Amino acid sequence: YIDAETMTLHHDKHHATYVANANAALEKHPEIGEDLEALLADVEQIPADIRQALINNGGGHLNHALFWELLSPEKQEPTAEVAAAINEAFGSFEAFQEAFTAAATTRFGSGWAWLVVNDEGKLEVVSTANQDTPISDGKKPILAL
């Protein structure tokens, strides 16, 4: 359970600020386009004067956007395909839950726990600090907390 006050703060303040700051950085270099996922997949292509701003704020936007997309008022079970991939990667859904919980609860300071598809097409649990996104490490996030 996450209370309404926390969700409002994250949506109306944090996420809105990440969007505004990412847009301000992108305005300085319109030639690079606005595809944050592509830019953050190869951060070296981002001009040095806005690189950290896009890593922080673009990452914050992408992370929160996925988080909002995944929220549901009702408990949802994974699809059969995802459940099979979880069982293959972790041995059981319970083992996945333990790994995901550990990633979320052992992160010092702010950050995220992720279920990602790695470059080998396999599921893994990772944690990132602050607003870093696993996209920058070549991973595709499918669950975020």
Swiss-Prot record:
Catalysed reactions listed for this entry: 2 superoxide + 2 H(+) = H2O2 + O2
UniProt entry tagged with the keyword Manganese: yes
Residues reported to bind Mn(2+): H10, H64
Cofactor binding, note field: Binds 1 Mn(2+) or Fe(3+) ion per subunit.
An MF annotation (GO) of this entry: superoxide dismutase activity
EC number: 1.15.1.1
Impact noted for substituting D119A: In strain: CIP 102503T and NEM1250
Keyword Nucleus recorded: no
Uppermost EC category: oxidoreductase
GO cellular component terms listed in the entry, alphabetical order: cytoplasm
Cofactor names: Mn(2+); Fe(3+)
Keywords: Iron, Manganese, Metal-binding, Oxidoreductase
List of residues binding Fe(3+): H10, H64
Protein role: Destroys superoxide anion radicals which are normally produced within the cells and which are toxic to biological systems. Catalyzes the dismutation of superoxide anion radicals into O2 and H2O2 by successive reduction and oxidation of the transition metal ion at the active site.
Similarity section: Belongs to the iron/manganese superoxide dismutase family.
Protein name per Swiss-Prot or TrEMBL: Superoxide dismutase [Mn/Fe]
Protein's organism: Streptococcus salivarius
